[in-house]
Amino acid sequence: MSQINLLLLCGGGGDEHAISLMSADFLETSLAKEPEINLLRVELDGQGHYRTQDGRSCELTNRKEIRFAAEEQAPWPVDYVIPCIHGFPGETGDIQSYFDLIKLPFFGCDSESSSNCFNKVTAKMWFSALGVPNTPYIFLNELNQESIAQTKQALENWGSIFIKAASQGSSVGCYRVDSQDELVSSLEQAFSFSPYVIVEKTINARELEVAAYELNGEIVATKPGEIICASNTFYSFDEKYAANSKAETKVEADVSEEVAQQIQAYAIKVFKGMKLSHLSRIDFFLTEDNEILLNEINTFPGLTPISMFPKMLQNHGDDFTHYLYSNIKSQLVSA
């Protein structure tokens, strides 16, 4: 195959902008090992402005090229794009719609599957429709006296709840509530991040994660890894990325073969059922009674030095650069 002009688009301007840049570093290092890849890294900010690493203003046009603000510089044709954008507008599916419109091949899930997974309400509807157990919840579409009363009743019934902004990732807009005193302020904060909110029953369980991805025409689900948080905490945004995080990770969780196989089967079922593409990290709860509950799907999981997806893929025996390049090549050949 001849040289591939690959656009590594990162940032996005949302709450996870900085994490997206860290993931882009990892991807850039991995792709540097492939001589056929001619990579241009471009950062997208919250105002929709594109800028190269050396500060040049540019834009991605409908002619599938990067056009630079300096008119004397020739446009850079784009063969393929990796939208390394956590949260909006990447994992929400927005930017993939534009790629489809201009017929530009891209890495990762398409617009519809990204949107369905990112919105916690639609995701849970899909989980239930596919017959995959998930956490009990209620759905709120407005902050008013009725929704406050519903949430108070949920807290009374379940003892402890999570209030979550429906359209955020990396635990942004996610609050554990154990008393009525915290309830209204947590709802207000969650609604400040999203017009829709879900209230979930707190599950006292182990947090397990699976890397589910495509390789050589097959869907692979790794053995589950585990996130171990300090007592009475959850895997918040700060716990994920703070330098002083007390959370620990295990690339392989200590679970029975039966539990591991069931989790892998659920992961493949939702990957196929929700028509995901190329990569995902699928998160589960495992209760003391060995009940498995699907928590969420990340359609563009973190690829930082501490992220679980590349670690689990490597532990499964797959080289990340080979996996990435194989998907790029197969997609371009079939395009």
Curated annotation (Swiss-Prot):
Binding residue positions for Mg(2+) 1: 283, 296
The job of this chain, per UniProt, is described as:
Cell wall formation.
Gene3D superfamilies from the xrefs? 3.40.50.20, ATP-grasp fold, A domain, ATP-grasp fold, B domain
Identify the residues that the record assigns to the ATP-grasp domain, covering every copy. Answer: 124-329
Q: Which cofactors are required for activity? A: Mg(2+); Mn(2+)
HAMAP family, sorted: Dala_Dala_lig
Q: What is this protein called?
A: D-alanine--D-alanine ligase
Q: Which organism is it from?
A: Shewanella woodyi (strain ATCC 51908 / MS32)
* Matches recorded under InterPro entries: ATP-grasp (IPR011761), ATP_grasp_subdomain_1 (IPR013815), D-Ala_lig_Van_CS (IPR000291), D_ala_D_ala (IPR005905), Dala_Dala_lig_C (IPR011095), Dala_Dala_lig_N (IPR011127), PreATP-grasp_dom_sf (IPR016185)
Bound cofactor: record note? Binds 2 magnesium or manganese ions per subunit.
